[in-house]
Amino acid sequence: MKIIILSGFLGSGKTTLLLNILKHNKEKNNSDIAILMNELGGFNVDSKIIGEETPYNELLNGCICCDLKQDVAVQISDLYHRHHPDYVIIEATGVAHPVKIYDACTDPVLTPIADVYNITTIVDAKRFLGRFKYTESTRRLMEEQIKYADIVIVNKIDTIENAERVELSHQLMQINARAQMIETSYSEIEFNLLEQKGNEQHGDIHMHHGISSVVYTFNGPIDSRAFVKWLTQLPDSVLRVKGFIKFRENKEQTVLFQYAYGIPQYEEELMNLPLKLVVIGEGLDKHKIMDQLDQLQFS
């Protein structure tokens, strides 16, 4: 099952784009699609206009990358087991950060059944050019939604002049020169977004523009001291490590491990879950990490 993360600031046209994707798919592709919609409030207007033929789940009263992050794996697993879709499209709230959504989608529980296929960000052309009137944190979010995208859809292009269009293109290229850039109005797309594969896969290595992840499967317990030593030498480019592991000191106990901003957390897990570790970061030397984890496993 493939996950498409649909990102973009408030009012950029995400829901209209989603409806156009569903319409295009129904007419030409006919893949099985399910939707996971996120809304900060307790009521999601957008979900009411999707139609009953498309399965969807909702995450309400919070942001998918903050308050509701732990619920993402549960909701995606539910969609998979109930509907077995080819794709799950996540329409995030406009203030969600794509890296944190990506993080939530690489939960070790999901890795056997789902893979992030592409990160698509839709941009309001005029609003983005005028982003400097917003706070620094808002401006940074708008830019980082573009930075980590595989596909950038520049929407409402009809609202700006030709000179502004050239300037906007220049600014977007400075932020993310590797993404596919599509200009449009009214969120209309002339291509099948479901066929735009944003990642390159080599076994258990998944890479997106600016952010990549490595999924490693252990076949048994590892030495805890060697594991801690490995953690201490991780570069700053490693943003997150998470997964289920066992240590040789207590071979029967599964441990939920999480690591962010240099801080490790260990929590006993009651269930006997697959021993998988996910490493997420920018510019990772993925093969080096795989080799290091091999050494942990076999030493």
What are these regions (language model features)?
Residues 1-2, 25, 294-299:
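Short, Lys/Arg-enriched, disordered terminal segments
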Residues 2-7, 12-134, 140:
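Nucleotide-state-sensitive switch-loop elements of NTP-binding domains
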Residues 19, 23, 30-31, 85, ...:
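A generic "cationic amphipathic patch" detector
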Residues 144-272, 284-286, 298-299:
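C-terminal accessory "lid"/substrate-recognition subdomains
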Residues 279:
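Flexible loop/N-cap segments at domain edges
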